[in-house]
Every structure is written in structure tokens, then in C-alpha cells.
């Protein structure tokens, strides 16, 4: 091994020292030293660049490798001292010449900064006169290409709150033969293991041994006149020369380019004099010169000379760089902003946000808390936390690491959110889904686009949906498992996780599965839903509305446009506005919808065929593309009333649809046998979404099934045509009560497939993402999480499934499905069913809506449905909900299979969309909605009109005629085809167009295309569709887009909302145009990324091969695209987002808000970013904060994000949000003295047995995070000597303290905020009720409650804590502790806490922020967050009182439009100590954990104090 000497030079500038809150006056000094691992032979030389500025108390000095800053004196609070000490550290090392670059990037360069202090006499000569009081170690991550140019504020510990700002520049400056000897550590043996470390200097090698290798020896030639050089030595010399020259030139190029960039961005910076060097040409020239030399001595000298010349050039450039930029204020400001942005972005990882309807705040939500713990466990079981890339300058004590970063969950309660898509998460089913999608993926890859081929799935007779899994589901689960095992390890992990879940949670998990394809606990959050419904959902039991079938009244309420509209409030108000428009468009649909339809929708419309089980594989032939066989397992509820309980269908009602497809030819020329058992009666309304489509022609409302022939343009659909007999749909809709099983033989041609009328029902069945049509009930109702999950999984887990079921379902079912998908989590059976749908389509609505109501709302508002012919405007539909699913965001593509009920989502989409086939896909829709009796002309115009009024002008104008569809690109067509598949429902092509707007071809989709696309996709037959499909539009249409990219899915789902919301900046047409292009990319990405989850969703790279490409072209194109994406995932923002977003970042909320997002923005914006932000602007920083990390770290992190995506976690992560709470670096602005607005007074109140310094860190991080703001803190100390008194006494003290503080300092108060810890929160609330404080009520701004026992300690689960508090109460005779237990009066309604809850207070605040932790056993979690707990529900005595207190506290808050309620759950990374065990560590972590507080405030909470 040949070693070379390298020198890396570091310039360390100590800019300023800030006294944040030092306790002692005296002399302070910063000492800096550089260390690298002892295993690398090295020497460190330190020096001061030049003395600048005042010497202060004493000047800076150098002591060997230690540099001491100026010594300065601190006398005053908030004092700033300008140091401007520039230290130069030259690190000389011996490196292996074969691994120079790798070694330099892996070395840990450790910069140690120590704070030294003395309050006595000080002599500069005596280093020991100053004592070390605090220190920080910075790990500098150096790169040869980029060097290191960074700025950081280094804060010392809690007891010495001070900050020193440090700027670091580093570059390689020399690389040559070893010129000095280096100490080498002597290996220790067991004999001298206790001896002090020893080292010996290494020998200095000769130049020849370095150039030619250590084994080189001179050999004379035969003539004795020259030396011979063996070929191996000569090759070594050439390689040595090339490697070192290339490395030096690389460092030169990096430093030169950075220098140029700095001089361009900072005009005041000195310009660069050196001419630019053509690095590659120079390297080639040097190598050619060396190869011309024959004499070994001359060769070695020439190589040495070349290296010396390059080193001199590099040193000259480095010297000029330092001269120009050292202590340059503008550059320091620029670097400080960069570091702050990266740091906040890094903190935003693992910070989750969930958005709920406002009324959900009063619902029983303990399942949410439990799901938070499960999510934490699942996240920690992945490599996400351990692979989090470090910052360029890393300090684990300040920036956090695997062992210290908390995971935070935020629950928002917004008027703009109608459906609760962020339901509790149970990992099992979501894992199953991912497995299923993997399975599908493999199969689709094998056979083509269809879905996964799985064993026949048979639906077990109706069983308690929540209690049993059908055998078919089990089989599906097994098959999925097998496939999943073949899939990514991450998915396997997920599966294991799911297996560990308890069966009883299965229902909940299934229901959850809609939004993010994460299984959501059956929890509905709809304003219309009664609290009992919420509770039932939470408990996993169907709400009464579910059991009874959706109540028409409820349905209407649920479909209330406002309710339905799930505004993307998650992200931004703008997205909300877009959603609002959407809701307005949708409202007419809801009005038309019948209760039954709503029910179906709630059930997810998957249960359309009550007992339809499709086993075997279905593939719609695509001329060009192979379609993998798919098995579909469909279970439909026996009746709309039973929708919630898909499995409730009678056992005799089981129907099996067996479709055998030729592996390559799809089903060309083959026959499929459809076996239909007796159908339970289904209410016509159930099947009909048509009522939802006001614009559609009314069909006879009789029960007779009517068929609508809808040609789906091959654009999206492929040439293949699929005809589902209207009768079959109608029968399904009408719930054919056929006791006997019937067999229908259907010839499947490449062009079309017709299914008997009796099978119509099956069309409405939902399709799982995995490509398996799963019984709606089977997934949702099945207790077996694995089965349900797998069924849901499908290729495009949640997101795709959500979209797809909506499209595939009959109109009513679709509507319900879309609605139901939202509410599936809420409704137990229905929600379960919907969950399966959602898993398929990642039903966003499921997650968001309350069980039944949510389902209804989401589906209807999104699209207008006319009879069974309803066309869903995907855009109009609650795609944002799908967005919420994020991962599967749109499986619709997959689902667009021609077969109405039996095809996989993916399979359907693929087949129907076979672009290769020019023939439009023909779908026969039965009037499944006999009740509505409205025949929706597939002209999506009606439903399109509502959603796309503005931009859709083209599509809207079109009639049901297929013409309108033609304009649609393949994407649109795909949308239509899913509709076809659904049988009665067609997705609005317009929506699809909206999403795909430009289609991959880039041509804007016409609204009419969109409109007609749903039913009549045939319009532009194949040409446009083919292009679009190739472009991935088809997938987009089906939602594969969203599947691939959560943000994409969101955008798509939201698209129609966006279009309907045209409210968005652009008309739909504009959006379509922009979105079309991006959608093309997105579609491809999505497909590639796994949005088409069946095929490639499992791919860690996030790319998914599209299996539903029309013909082979589409498949090939998609695969190519996916390959490109995978290969370019690091460079492509879209791809990366897909990867990043996939798990962690796929935020349902973002998706909801996404409606405002434009598809075009998607291509520009990271998938992650798009999702979370309902904003349409691009934002790259969500993924860019780690872009300068080493590629292996970036790759590992993206892989971990993919793992996280597989978990289908609900909500979104703040890392995907473009704008975070903090944007201004610490100390970046001076306080504005002349503000006329007055000061913002923040009163901090400590807890039991606390003192005024308890909230010192909270104060610090708010002050640092709001530079320039006029903020004044009152750290309450009046009660610190006696916190055991009763609350009335402590209230009087605090009130006096506040009023006196304002008067003494003559403050002009513009805002008053309160921050309380523990007991202090009750004192604050009590102050608000006092007459003397009435004057200040109008100035109240934010109430931040940190672990406050607002409901007392009545239901504390810790016996140890209860015993301790009881003892303390008796010992101290504490009135406050007695009042906390609600035992201070014999009548519970006369206790202090109950009376306090009846008094006005909280609703006066603009923000009510409740922070709690499940790890905190001092204060019950539900008491800190003011929510119902399970124990209180069971307590017949005090439980009612507890519930009344919650309503008394929150009802005024919820009714006040100007009051924002937010709850947080903090999962701290706590060590295994006694404090952690008894729950004390978490209780005080909200006060003394720097990393938690900084993460909490920088990412989210600072906005409450701005």
C-alpha cells in the first residue's frame, strides 16, 4: 500500500458571542482544537490568520494545536461580543493513494469548542486560570468536490446559555509524497493493554518507492546505460500520477466554482483574478506528458513536479479565497440562512400532522393516541431514524440523532376538513397492503399490466365483517405475503409488523386503510356524525348509521358540499379555497344522492356485489402489453344497509368470478366463466351514484337495470373494449336476489368483454391495489388484518385503491366508495369495506370522513353521479382524499380494468386502458341505481360542470357523447375505463384530464374529454390515449400517479377539486395544460414509483413499471420511465419526492390540500412537498436539505423513506411542507424599538413545586426563533414558594403579578399569550375567569399548554403516581392536589375543575395548543389534550361528568371561528431510567429537552407567537 501526504486546511471564524442567559459575570474565553481519529497518522498545526478588531480583555493566542479566542468580559444581560477570531488548522495526514477521496469524506474532523470562565483575576499566560464550564464538539463533513463552507450557531448547555457563531471553510490544499514523519499508534497487546498509548514516527519513504510502489527496485539495462522499469511499476506510476492530479484538480474546480458563485451572489466580495482552468484538458495534458518519459528518474521527478505545480495553484487559490471572504459579513449572513434552513428542514422529519374535522375534537380519540405509539414503533423498526443524514456541521447535542430526536404528532381541527382522513393507524393491514402491492407488482411484471395473480379468492359467507376474514382473503393474504416476501425487505418488515398486531385491531386497521393506505382505526369524523358514531368507529364497531345503512338524512348532510369538501386545509388556505370550490361543485351531487347510495359509497362501493367473489385471474387483453393474471376477490354487502358490513352477505350469496387469461394475450379469445350465487337484495340507491350527478339525464327510477354503452377511448383504455352488461350492473344494483348460482360464459376478446347482467353487481365491487378485487367487507370487515391488508394492498395501496374503487364502483357505489373510502375508517363494517377500497385506491375520503357520513361526503361532492351510469369526475371526486392516501394515491389506473367488478384496480385500469388497442373501451352500465332512475349520459358534463366549471369548458360542454372523451388523453381515458369497470360509475375523464390535464402528450385535456371520459372514454380513441398511456396519463387517471407519488396522488385526487376549485389560480384548462405535462411525468413517475403499487410500488427506488400500459408500448414506455426514474431518483426532484414521500411523506393532508396544487407543479415540486403543501408552487428544499450529504447516505435515507412509505402512515410530515414556522436565523435581526403595535407579553407559569426558571428554555427558543420581534416575557414567580395552596389563592397571586408587571414597566400590550406547565395551566385558566382580567381578554393570542391536567388526574393509569400524589396531598395538606382529583366537593358538579370548565376562557385565544405525551404518567394524556378516555367511557358515575367537562371546555372553542385548536403528542427518545419508568422524564422533557423544544418551535409552534 502506497501512502501519500494530504493536507486539508480549515479556516474557523469565531464571529460573535451572545450572552443568552448566563448566570455569572466574569471573564469568558472560547478555546478551539481540531481532532481526527488516531487510526490515521496525522499532525495538526494551528495558527491565527491575523489579529483583527479590538483585543477586548486579552488578545487571542495559540498554544500548540490549541487556539484561544480573545478573552472577554460579560457584564450584562443579552450582551453581544464581537470576536472575529480567524483560526487556521492545517491537518496533515497519510492516506492510501487508492482511497484518497473516500477516506477524506469518511474521516471525522472534530472541532472542539470549549467555554472557559473565571470570575477572579486572570493572566493570559496561565491557561489553567480559566476553568472549562461547557463544551461542544462539531463534526465537520468535508467533501473534496464541494469543500466545506458553512456557518453554525453553537449553543452551550442549559446552565451556561450562550451562543458562539462559527463560520468554517475547508479545502484540500496539498497532495504529494510524504515529506515528514507521522506518529503511528502502537498496537496494544494483552501484555501492555494498560500501558499509556504509545506511538512511533513513521519512516519517510523515497520518491521512487512512492511513485513506482513500495516493492520497486532499480534494475540496469543489459547495456548498463539506463534503468529498466517493469510494466507493473510503470502502470503504478501512471495510475498514481493520474489519481493525485485528478484529485487536486477536482478540489481546485470545486473551490474555484464556489468562489465564482460567492462573488456573483455577493457583489461586495472581491472578484477572482485567476483565470478559469479547463480541468479535464489539463489532466489529459499532464498524463500525456508523463507517458512520453522513459527514464525512471525523470519520470518520478516529472510526476513530483506536476503535483507540486498543482498544489501551488490550489494553495494560491485558497489563499486568495480566504483573503476575499474571511470575516465577510454578507457571506456570513448567507451561510447562516442556509444552515438555518437545512436545520429546520432536518427537524421537520418525523414531525407528523393530521387534519380532522373541527367537530372531531370532541370525539373519543384514544385510538389515535395508541396508533401514534404504533407508528413510532414502526418508524423505529425501519432505518429511517438511523439513516437521517447529518448537517454539514453536525453537533448531536444540538441537532439530535437517533437516540435523542423525538417524534411529534400534530392534530389539527379545521372547518375546511369535512372528512377525517387521518384516522388512527394500525400497521398490520397497511403492511399487508404493501405486500399485496408487491405481489401484484411482480405478477404484473411477469404477465403484464393486470394485477397480481393470486390464488382463487373465495368469499366466505357473510360473517361479522370485523370479526372474520374470508378464506379468499386469507388466501389472498398468503399469496400477497409470498409475493411480498419476494419484494423489498421493507415491505417484509411491514408484514411482520402487521402480524404482530392484535386481531381485534384488525377492523380498526382495515378502516384506517383508506387514506394513506394505512389501516385506520374505525373512526369517523364528520360533523354530521353523532359522537356516538365516532366512538363506535373508534371502537371498531359500526356506527348505528352504518348498521342501519346510511340514513338518507345523514347522507345528505354528509354530502353537504361544505362537509364533503375536504379542504386541503392541511397545508394552506389557498388549497382550502380550491377545495371549497370543489365542494360547491359537488354539492348538487350530494343532494341528488340517495341514502342508499351514500351507504354504498360509505361501504366504499366495493360491496356492490354482495357476495361476489372473483377468483382466478382477470386480464383485459391489451394488444401490445402482457397483462398479469389477477385474481379478484369481491364481496359485496347483501344490501345497502349492510354496506358497512361487506361480509354480512349470506353465505349462499357468495359468487365467484373466475377469469382465466392467457398470460400474454390477456383474455383474447378466451372465455371467462362468471359464477354468480344468489344475490342479496341491494337497495338500488346503494348502487346508484347517478343521483349524485345532477347533470346526467334521469333514468327511469324503476328497478329495471339499464345499460349504458360507453365506449372508452383507447386513449386511456387501450384498444380493448370491455362491455359489462348493463344488466349485470343493474342486477347488482338492484340486488338480484338469485338464490341459485348462475354461470355465465363470457368470451373475452381483446377488444371487449361483456359480462352478464347478473354480474353487474360485481363491477361495483372494489378492487384492491394489489390487483385483487377484494370483498369490500373482506378487507374492512375482516378481523384478520393481514388478509384485509393484503386485499387492500394491491399495486397502489391506499391511494390507488381509493381512487380506483370510486371509479370502478357503480356510480352509487363509487360515490359511496369515494365517500366511503373517506369514511371507511370511521364506519366499522362500511369503513372496513371502504378501507379495502381505500387500500385499493387509498381511499382518501375514507380516512377523512367520519364513518358513514364521511364516505358519503367524499364520494358525492367529488363527482356527480347519475344512475348507475354515474361518471365520477376524478378531479371532482375527493381525490385530495386519495391524495391523503398518498401512497396508493391513485390505483385507478390499475383499477381501470374493463371488467366492472372483478378486475384488479390495476388490472382494470391497465386493461381498459390498453393503449395499444385503438378501439375505445366499451362499457355497459346497468342502471344499477334503479332508485335514482336517472340515466347518466356518460357525457360527464353534468358532474364535470360542477367540478370543472372554469377550465373544463371543453369537456363540460361535451355531452354524454363519447366525443368529449376523445380529447382526453390516455389518462382521461383511463379514468373513464375505471368507471366502466365500476360498471355504474365512470370516473370523470375530465377529472382525469384535470389531473392529467396535458396528458403525457402534453396536450391539454379537454374538459369534455374529462367529462365523457368517465363513461364515454371512447371519444378520442386510441391515438391520444396511447400517447397518454405511454406518458403515464392512464396511470394518472387511475390514480397510479398519486400512487407513485403521494404528492402526485394528492395532486390528482385534488385535481378535479382543483379544477372544480378552479378557484385555484388557473382555470382547469390551464391547470390541465400544466398539470398534463407534469402529470405525464408524474404519471410515469407514479407508475414507476409504485403508484401503480401492484407492479413497482414495492420498488425501493420508488419507480414503478406500469403494467397497464396499452399494449407493449405502454408497458415498455412505463418500464423505461420507471427505470429512468429509478436510475435518476437522486437527481429527479419528482422521483426523489416519490421515494421520500412514499412513506413518510405521503401526507393525506397534503393531498387534500393538493387540490389546489397543480399537476404541473408536481413535476417541478418534490412529491413530498406537493402533497403536504396544498400549495401549487414548487419547493425543492424538502428534499434538498440533505442533497450535499455523501451519496451513500442520501441513498440510504431515500431507501428509508421508501420503507416508511410502505407503512402507509396517515397524515403528512412537515418535511413535505414548503413553508415551516421558522425562516429567520437566530440573531439575524435587531429588535424593532419603534413599533407602534406594542409588545407581545408572554406569561410563563410553572407547575407543582416548580419555579420561575422552569420555562427558561421555552422562553429562550421563542426569543431566538422570533428575532426582531417585540416580545416580553413574564416568568411568573409569585407562586413558586407555595404551589400546594388551592387554586383560588394561586390565581389571585398570578393575576396580581401580571397586572403589576404591566403597570410597573408601563407596557403597551398588543397581545398576551400564556405558556403553562402542568399545574400552571389550571392557574392560567382560572385567571381568565376573573373580572379584573376582563380588560385583557380581547388581547389574548395563544395559550400553549405543556402537559396540563385540564381534566384533573381522575383517570390516571399510574398507580405509583396516584399513590405519590395522594401521599403528597395528605402530607402537604394541598388544596390544589385535592382539587385535581375532583374530590374537593361531594357533588362532582360543584368541584373546582367542573365549575372552571363552565366558565368562559379558552375561546378568547386565537390559538389553543395542547401538548401531551403518552409517556407522561404524571398528567394523563387525555387530560393534557382535553379529550375523552376509555376509562371514563366505562365509568357510569364520574364518566358523564368527565364528558361534560370536555364539552364545556371545547364547545366554545369549536364554535369560535377565530379560535384555532391544535393538539400535540410527543414521543420522546428517553433513556431507560427510573424517571422514564415512572413517567417523570416525559413530564419535564417539555421543559428541559433542548432538542424537543427547538424542533417543536422551529417547525411548527413559532407561528402561534408571531
Curated annotation (Swiss-Prot):
Domain of life: Eukaryota
InterPro entries, sorted: AB_hydrolase_fold, DUF3657, DUF676_lipase-like, Lipase-like
The protein's name: Protein FAM135A
Lineage: Eukaryota, Metazoa, Chordata, Craniata, Vertebrata
Polar residues bias spans: 564-580, 629-654, 950-964
Family per record: Belongs to the FAM135 family.
Source organism of this protein record: Mus musculus (Mouse)
Gene3D superfamilies to which the protein is assigned, alphabetical: alpha/beta hydrolase
UniProt-annotated stretches for the region Disordered: 536-596, 629-662, 935-964
Amino acid at each position: 500500500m502506497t501512502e501519500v501526504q494530504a493536507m486539508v486546511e480549515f479556516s474557523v471564524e469565531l464571529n460573535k458571542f451572545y450572552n443568552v442567559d448566563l448566570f455569572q459575570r466574569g471573564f469568558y474565553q472560547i478555546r478551539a482544537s481540531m481532532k481526527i481519529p488516531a487510526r490515521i497518522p496525522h499532525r495538526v498545526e494551528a495558527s491565527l490568520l491575523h489579529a483583527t478588531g479590538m483585543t477586548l480583555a486579552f488578545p487571542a493566542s495559540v498554544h500548540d494545536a490549541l487556539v484561544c479566542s480573545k478573552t472577554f468580559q460579560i457584564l450584562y444581560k443579552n450582551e453581544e461580543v464581537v470576536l472575529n477570531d480567524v483560526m487556521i488548522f492545517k491537518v496533515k495526514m497519510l492516506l492510501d493513494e487508492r482511497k484518497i477521496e473516500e477516506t477524506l469524506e469518511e474521516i471525522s474532523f472534530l472541532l472542539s469548542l470549549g467555554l472557559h470562565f473565571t470570575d477572579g483575576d486572570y493572566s493570559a499566560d496561565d491557561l489553567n486560570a480559566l476553568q472549562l464550564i461547557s463544551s461542544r464538539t462539531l463534526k465537520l463533513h468535508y467533501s473534496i468536490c464541494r469543500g466545506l463552507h458553512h456557518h453554525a450557531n453553537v449553543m452551550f448547555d442549559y446552565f451556561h446559555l450562550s451562543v458562539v457563531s462559527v463560520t468554517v471553510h475547508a479545502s484540500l490544499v496539498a497532495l504529494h509524497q510524504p515529506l515528514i514523519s507521522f506518529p503511528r499508534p502502537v498496537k496494544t497487546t494483552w501484555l501492555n493493554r494498560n500501558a499509556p498509548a504509545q506511538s512511533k514516527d513513521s519512516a519517510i519513504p523515497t520518491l521512487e518507492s512512492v511513485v513506482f510502489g513500495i516493492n520497486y527496485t532499480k534494475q540496469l539495462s543489459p547495456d548498463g546505460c539506463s534503468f529498466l522499469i517493469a510494466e507493473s511499476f510503470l502502470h503504478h506510476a501512471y495510475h498514481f500520477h493520474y489519481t493525485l492530479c485528478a484529485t487536486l484538480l477536482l478540489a481546485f474546480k470545486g473551490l474555484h466554482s464556489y468562489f465564482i458563485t460567492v462573488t456573483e451572489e455577493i457583489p461586495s466580495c472581491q472578484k477572482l483574478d485567476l483565470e478559469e482552468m479547463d480541468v479535464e484538458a489539463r489532466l489529459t495534458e499532464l498524463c500525456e506528458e508523463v507517458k512520453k518519459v522513459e527514464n525512471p528518474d525523470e519520470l518520478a521527478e516529472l510526476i513530483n513536479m506536476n503535483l507540486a505545480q498543482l498544489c501551488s495553484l490550489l494553495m494560491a487559490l485558497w489563499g486568495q479565497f480566504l483573503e476575499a471572504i474571511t470575516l465577510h459579513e454578507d457571506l456570513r449572513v448567507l451561510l447562516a440562512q442556509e444552515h438555518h434552513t437545512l436545520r429546520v428542514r432536518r427537524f421537520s422529519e418525523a414531525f407528523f400532522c393530521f387534519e380532522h374535522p373541527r367537530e372531531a375534537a370532541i370525539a373519543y380519540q384514544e385510538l389515535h393516541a395508541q396508533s401514534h405509539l404504533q407508528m413510532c414503533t414502526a418508524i423505529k423498526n425501519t432505518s429511517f431514524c438511523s439513516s437521517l443524514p447529518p448537517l454539514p456541521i453536525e453537533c448531536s447535542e444540538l441537532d439530535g440523532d437517533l437516540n435523542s430526536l423525538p417524534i411529534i404528532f400534530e392534530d389539527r381541527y379545521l372547518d375546511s376538513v369535512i372528512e377525517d382522513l387521518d384516522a388512527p393507524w394500525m400497521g398490520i393491514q397497511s403492511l399487508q397492503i404493501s405486500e399485496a402491492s408487491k405481489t401484484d407488482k411482480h405478477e404484473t411484471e411477469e404477465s403484464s399490466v393486470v394485477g397480481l395473480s393470486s390464488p382463487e379468492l373465495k368469499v366466505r359467507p357473510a360473517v361479522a365483517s370485523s370479526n372474520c376474514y374470508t378464506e379468499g382473503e386469507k388466501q389472498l393474504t398468503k399469496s400477497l405475503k409470498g409475493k411480498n416476501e419476494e419484494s423489498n425487505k421493507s415491505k417484509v418488515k411491514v408484514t411482520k409488523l402487521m402480524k404482530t398486531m392484535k386481531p381485534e385491531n384488525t377492523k380498526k386497521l382495515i378502516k384506517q386503510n383508506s387514506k394513506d393506505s394505512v389501516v385506520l382505526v374505525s373512526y369517523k369524523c364528520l360533523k354530521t356524525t353523532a359522537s356516538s358514531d365516532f366512538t363506535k368507529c373508534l371502537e371498531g364497531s359500526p356506527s348505528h348509521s352504518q348498521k342501519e345503512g346510511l340514513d338518507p338524512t345523514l347522507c345528505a348532510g354528509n354530502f353537504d358540499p361544505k362537509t364533503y369538501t375536504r379542504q386541503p386545509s392541511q397545508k394552506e388556505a389557498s388549497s382550502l379555497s380550491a377545495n371549497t370550490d370543489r365542494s360547491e361543485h359537488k354539492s348538487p351531487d350530494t343532494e341528488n344522492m340517495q341514502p342508499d347510495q351514500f351507504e354504498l359509497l360509505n361501504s366504499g362501493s366495493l360491496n356492490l356485489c354482495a357476495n361476489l367473489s372473483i377468483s382466478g385471474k382477470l386480464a383485459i387483453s391489451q394488444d401490445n402489453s402482457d397483462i398479469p393474471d389477477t385474481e379478484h376477490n369481491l364481496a359485496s354487502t347483501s344490501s345497502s344497509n349492510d354496506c358497512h358490513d361487506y361480509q354480512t352477505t349470506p353465505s349462499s350469496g357468495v359468487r365467484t368470478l373466475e377469469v382465466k387469461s392467457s398470460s400474454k394475450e390477456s383474455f383474447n379469445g378466451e372465455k371467462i366463466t362468471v359464477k354468480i350465487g344468489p344475490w342479496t337484495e341491494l337497495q338500488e340507491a346503494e348502487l346508484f351514484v347517478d343521483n349524485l350527478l345532477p347533470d346526467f339525464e334521469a333514468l327511469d327510477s324503476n328497478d329495471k337495470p339499464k345499460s349504458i354503452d360507453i365506449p372508452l377511448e383507447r386513449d386511456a383504455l387501450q384498444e380493448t373494449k370491455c362491455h359489462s352488461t348493463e344488466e349485470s350492473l343493474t342486477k347488482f344494483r338492484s340486488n338480484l336476489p338469485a338464490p341459485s348460482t348462475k354461470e355465465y360464459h363470457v368470451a373475452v376478446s381483446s377488444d371487449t368483454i361483456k359480462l352478464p347482467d347478473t354480474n353487474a353487481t360485481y363491477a361495483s365491487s372494489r378492487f384492491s391495489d394489489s390487483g385483487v378485487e377484494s370483498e369490500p367487507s373482506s378487507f374492512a370487515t375482516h378481523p384478520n388484518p393481514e388478509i384485509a391488508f393484503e386485499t387492500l394492498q394491491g399495486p397502489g395501496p391506499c391511494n390507488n385503491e381509493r381512487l380506483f374503487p370510486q371509479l370502478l364502483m357503480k356510480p352509487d357505489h363509487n360515490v359511496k366508495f369515494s365517500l366511503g373510502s373517506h369514511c371507511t375508517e370511521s364506519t366499522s363494517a362500511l369503513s372496513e369495506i371502504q378501507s379495502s377500497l381505500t387500500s385499493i385506491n387509498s381511499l382518501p375520503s375514507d380516512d377523512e370522513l367520519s364513518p358513514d357520513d364521511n364516505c358519503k361526503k367524499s364520494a358525492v361532492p367529488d363527482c356527480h353521479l347519475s344512475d348507475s351510469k354515474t361518471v365520477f369526475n376524478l378531479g371532482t371526486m375527493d381525490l385530495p382524499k386519495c391524495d391523503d392516501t398518498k401512497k396508493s394515491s391513485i390505483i385507478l389506473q390499475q383499477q381501470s380494468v374493463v371488467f366492472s367488478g372483478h378486475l384488479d384496480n390495476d388490472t382494470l385500469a391497465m386493461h381498459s386502458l390498453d393503449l395499444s388497442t385503438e378501439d375505445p373501451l366499451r362499457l355497459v352500465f346497468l342502471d344499477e341505481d334503479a332508485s335514482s332512475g336517472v340515466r347518466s349520459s356518460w357525457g360527464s358534463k353534468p358532474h364535470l360542470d360542477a367540478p370543472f366549471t372554469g377550465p373544463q369548458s371543453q369537456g363540460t360542454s361535451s355531452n354524454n357523447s363519447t366525443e368529449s372523451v376523445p380529447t382526453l388523453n390516455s389518462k382521461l381515458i383511463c379514468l373513464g375505463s375505471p368507471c366502466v369497470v365500476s360498471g355504474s360509475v365512470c370516473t370523470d375523464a375530465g377529472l382525469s384530464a384535470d389531473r392529467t390535464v396535458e396528458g403525457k402528450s402534453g396536450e391539454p385535456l379537454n374538459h369534455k374529454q374529462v367529462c365523457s371520459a368517465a363513461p364515454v372514454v371512447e371519444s378520442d380513441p386510441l391515438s391520444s390515449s396511447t400517447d397518454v398511456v405511454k406518458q403515464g396519463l392512464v396511470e394518472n387517471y387511475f390514480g397510479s400517479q398519486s400512487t407513485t407519488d403521494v404528492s402526485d396522488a394528492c395532486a390528482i385526487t385534488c385535481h378535479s377539486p382543483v379544477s372544480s376549485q378552479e378557484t385555484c389560480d388557473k382555470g382547469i384548462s390551464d391547470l390541465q395544460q400544466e398539470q398534463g405535462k407534469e402529470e405525464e411525468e408524474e404519471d410515469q413517475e407514479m407508475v414507476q414509483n409504485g403508484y401503480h403499487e401492484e407492479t413497482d410500488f414495492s420498488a425501493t427506488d420508488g419507480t414503478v413499471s406500469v403494467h397497464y400500459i396499452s399494449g407493449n408500448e405502454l408497458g415498455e414506455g412505463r418500464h423505461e420511465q420507471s427505470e429512468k426514474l429509478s436510475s435518476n431518483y437522486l437527481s429527479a426532484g419528482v422521483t426523489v419526492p416519490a421515494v421520500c414521500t412514499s412513506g413518510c411523506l405521503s401526507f393525506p393532508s397534503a393531498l387534500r390540500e393538493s387540490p389546489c396544487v397543480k399537476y404541473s407543479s408536481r413535476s417541478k415540486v418534490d412529491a413530498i412537498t406537493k402533497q403536504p403543501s396544498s400549495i401549487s408552487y414548487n419547493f425543492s428544499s424538502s428534499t434538498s436539505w440533505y442533497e450535499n450529504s455523501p451519496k451513500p447516505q442520501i441513498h440510504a435515507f431515500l431507501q428509508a423513506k421508501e420503507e416508511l412509505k410502505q407503512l402507509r402512515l396517515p397524515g403528512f410530515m412537515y418535511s413535505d411542507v414548503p413553508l415551516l414556522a421558522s425562516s429567520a436565523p437566530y440573531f439575524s435581526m435587531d429588535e424593532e424599538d419603534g413599533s407602534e403595535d406594542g409588545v407581545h407579553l408572554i406569561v410563563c407559569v410553572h407547575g407543582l413545586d416548580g419555579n420561575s426558571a422552569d420555562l427558561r428554555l421555552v422562553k429562550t427558543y421563542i426569543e431566538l426563533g422570533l428575532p426582531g420581534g417585540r416580545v416580553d416575557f413574564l416568568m411568573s414567580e409569585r407562586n413558586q414558594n407555595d404551589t400546594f395552596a388551592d387554586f383560588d389563592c394561586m390565581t389571585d397571586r398570578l393575576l396580581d403579578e401580571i397586572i403589576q408587571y404591566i403597570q410597573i414597566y408601563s407596557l403597551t400590550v398588543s397581545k398576551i399569550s400564556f405558556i403553562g406547565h402542568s399545574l400552571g395551566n389550571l392557574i392560567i385558566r382560572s385567571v381568565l375567569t376573573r373580572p379584573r382580567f376582563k380588560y385583557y381578554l380581547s388581547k389574548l393570542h395563544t395559550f400553549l399548554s405543556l402537559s396540563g391536567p385540564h381534566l384533573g388526574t381522575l383517570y390516571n393509569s399510574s398507580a405509583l403516581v396516584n399513590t405519590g400524589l395522594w401521599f403528597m396531598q395528605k402530607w402537604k395538606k394541598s388544596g390544589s392536589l385535592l382539587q385535581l382529583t375532583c374530590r374537593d366537593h361531594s357533588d362532582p358538579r360543584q368541584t373546582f375543575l367542573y365549575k372552571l370548565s363552565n366558565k368562559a376562557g379558552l375561546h378568547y385565544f386565537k390559538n389553543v395548543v395542547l401538548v401531551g405525551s403518552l409517556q407522561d404518567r404524571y398528567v394523563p394524556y387525555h387530560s393534557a389534550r382535553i379529550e375523552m378516555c376509555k376509562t371514563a367511557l366505562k365509568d357510569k358515575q364520574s364518566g358523564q361528568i368527565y364528558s361534560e367537562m370536555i364539552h364545556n371546555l371545547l364547545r366554545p372553542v369549536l364554535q369560535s371561528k377565530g379560535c384555532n385548536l391544535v393538539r400535540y403528542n410527543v414521543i420522546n427518545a428517553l433513556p431507560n431510567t427510573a424517571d422514564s419508568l415512572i413517567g417523570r422524564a416525559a413530564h419535564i422533557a417539555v421543559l428541559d429537552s433542548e432538542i424537543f423544544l427547538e424542533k417543536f418551535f422551529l417547525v411548527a409552534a413559532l407561528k402561534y407567537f408571531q
